[in-house]
């Protein structure tokens, strides 16, 4: 198998002219990605002694002088890069900035093992708290009544003479905004695809879809162009007031009704009250059993007070997780709509929203409901082979692929009343929802201290009540949950939590059956554990065996109590089990399935570093992506970002911000062709190195200024009010001096 083989992808025609020509070199002539100071003894002679190769391929591979090459000591935790690509990078503090590897806990928030008051460690370590991204806005604010209207036919402004925004279109275009961007050939990417632009006059490419028309009376009018013949009929909602092809948009009036408690959630309230009563009854039964003085008659009286739940759960839509369905993990900040859309393009068969909190969902807060938006590509069924669909497997026989989709929502909640209400709200207002996932693993301090996320790991009874209640009100939408091994190291809790989520406690199960959890994902780490330690796939394998034992004994369990009810069982009477942690290649993926016996693998950081990991899984081989191909993915993200957030000043600022968040992971990718041995490990950090061309070197930079330069290849110069602070301080360099 050729490790350098790659699957061809379409490249933007303007890529070479707009991106590669914008590659910026540093003042000393070295690639901007590396602030290289050559060894004092070698000076310029060290550079002269470098050997240039691969001239025939148009690439410049630089080999350091013999004195610069260090012995191959195979350092644990360090990526094994070929000697000819290594360089020496010395910063003012006399150490390599890469000596401190990136702290992936920064992506999830400070954990309890770190102090919440004074910062324990200062300088370049740790994460930047309360990051400021500045503000990208026009100097003159154009009224929305003018934004999408031609000059002589504006919409009515509800504020009238009291409006403090500009209604003078020509003044706005001349003085109130930056000049049009020159990237993408000066043509609006949204207009080129859809035939109209929902940013209207605020678009930073507006010159490409406007014209001045002379009317019969001699007046000249500025008009917006529309060419709806360019666009295909969307599967999702499309309007000139919102993103094209985006589904799960909730009307403002509905969110306002939620905020005023005007939405009917009586089913949730009724079920929560019943569950509180039944939980109290279970406690009394338990106390009666342990009290030897209680007579059997009293136990019988307590059992007689049992009341059936007010309603039964609806039968759920069938799910399928298997070898062909790698799943993108729910990712805070990075798991935005454009990135998920990119991963679906590259082969992700399942996606999740960023984690939303139950209480703001119930209150109708815009920030949480915005996380529920999905692209129409996420509403398509997972791609399965004809052999799988024709299988005689009992799971596949009851699975309807045409009714399935890829996008699921993830929520966190600290109590069953909140979780039940949130589940009812989501299933009421979101028509495109594969499943609702309960987060029982988030390590963020704020979530943990509120009793949600990983705090639930120590409260297995609460996990069962939440899943049982959500399952009761979610209609046909299945309920799943995501766990960690536990809270503290050497104190695993996952097996107990899986037992409660799948089987239920004996008291509940005897009367109500199983809770109805359709799938469980286990992240192979504890809350306390750092990302520098590998995920525990051995423990995941033990939990997979527990799930299999449930499958084997399911009929035995249900037959001893009552005839199983389809509404109390997981879809297809199966509980799928997903593993999560350190999956970085097709080799990791298939090893997890074959050796740990999970149904499929959920991929998080691996997809952030190289989104084409899904392509590798489908191809069954490593793909050595060139710098041009990788830049094509960045361009695609920018296009998707502008479609989602707009091509105006604010939308491009938002796209730039989330692109930089993506690049804060993507720079860590070490091309396969530069490695001495395979497989690559996700926690291996590379020493300073040069790429096979200048663009590849730039993409490997851990300096956030270089990430901004990459963003400017497609989004133009950053607005003067734009700011960016990386999550991890080691990427910031001189940020303290900048204030």
Curated annotation (Swiss-Prot):
The keyword Ligase does not apply. It comes from the Eukaryota. A zinc finger (C3H1-type) spans 137-170, 187-212. One of its GO terms (molecular function) is RNA binding. Its EC number is 1.3.1.89, 1.3.1.-. One of its GO terms (cellular component) is nuclear periphery. Its cofactor is FMN. FMN binds at residues 330-332, 410, 482, 523, 580-582, 604-605. Residues 32-51 have a biased composition (Basic and acidic residues). One of its GO terms (biological process) is mRNA processing. The active site is at 442 (proton donor). Signal peptide: none annotated. Residues 1-77, 92-133 are annotated as: Disordered. It is found in: Cytoplasm; Nucleus. It catalyses: 5,6-dihydrouridine(47) in tRNA + NAD(+) = uridine(47) in tRNA + NADH + H(+); 5,6-dihydrouridine(47) in tRNA + NADP(+) = uridine(47) in tRNA + NADPH + H(+); a 5,6-dihydrouridine in mRNA + NAD(+) = a uridine in mRNA + NADH + H(+); a 5,6-dihydrouridine in mRNA + NADP(+) = a uridine in mRNA + NADPH + H(+). InterPro entries: Aldolase_TIM (IPR013785), DUS-like_FMN-bd (IPR035587), tRNA_hU_synthase_CS (IPR018517), Znf_CCCH (IPR000571). Belongs to the Dus family. Dus3 subfamily. Catalyzes the synthesis of dihydrouridine, a modified base found in the D-loop of most tRNAs. Specifically modifies U47 in cytoplasmic tRNAs. Catalyzes the synthesis of dihydrouridine in some mRNAs, thereby affecting their translation. This is tRNA-dihydrouridine(47) synthase [NAD(P)(+)]. It comes from Pyricularia oryzae (strain 70-15 / ATCC MYA-4617 / FGSC 8958) (Rice blast fungus).
